[in-house]
């Protein structure tokens, strides 16, 4: 029983570490996108935003991807492009 608990705690710690790494990657990408947008002329920003939104509109998600996940991604991309981090 102790071995099972130890193994479960180890797996939980590994999952937590993986989660921290993913959060760090997302935050780094947010910073990069924000910096890039801020250094672009307004018309270039708008052009990029429209290109990304058009690309998303043209993508059909796999049937195994829940609609909620697809909508969450779309909302997050829109938020990031239209209202970048401060």
Curated annotation (Swiss-Prot):
Listed GO CC annotations: cytoplasm
> For this UniProt entry, what is the primary localization, expressed as one broad class?
cytoplasm
Question: Keyword annotations for this protein?
Answer: Coiled coil, Cytoplasm, Stress response
Classification via Pfam families: Anti-adapt_IraP (PF10796)
- Locations listed in the record: Cytoplasm
Coiled-coil annotated residue ranges, if any: 1-36
List the GO biological process terms: cellular response to starvation
Subunit info here reads:
Interacts with RssB.
Q: Could you tell me which HAMAP family the record lists for this protein?
A: Anti_adapt_IraP (MF_01198)
- UniProt function note: Inhibits RpoS proteolysis by regulating RssB activity, thereby increasing the stability of the sigma stress factor RpoS especially during phosphate starvation, but also in stationary phase and during nitrogen starvation. Its effect on RpoS stability is due to its interaction with RssB, which probably blocks the interaction of RssB with RpoS, and the consequent delivery of the RssB-RpoS complex to the ClpXP protein degradation pathway.
Q: What is this protein called?
A: Anti-adapter protein IraP
Which species does this protein come from? Citrobacter koseri (strain ATCC BAA-895 / CDC 4225-83 / SGSC4696)
Taxonomic lineage = Bacteria, Pseudomonadati, Pseudomonadota, Gammaproteobacteria, Enterobacterales
Q: Which gene encodes it?
A: iraP
């Amino acid at each position: 029983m102790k071995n099972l608990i130890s193994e479960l705690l180890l797996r939980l710690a590994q999952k937590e570490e993986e989660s921290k790494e993913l959060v760090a990657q997302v935050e780094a990408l947010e910073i990069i996108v924000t910096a890039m947008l801020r250094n672009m002329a307004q018309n270039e920003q708008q052009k990029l935003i429209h290109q990304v939104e058009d690309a998303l509109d043209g993508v059909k998600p796999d049937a195994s991807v829940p609609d909620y996940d697809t909508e969450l991604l779309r909302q997050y991309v829109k938020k990031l492009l239209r209202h970048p981090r401060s």
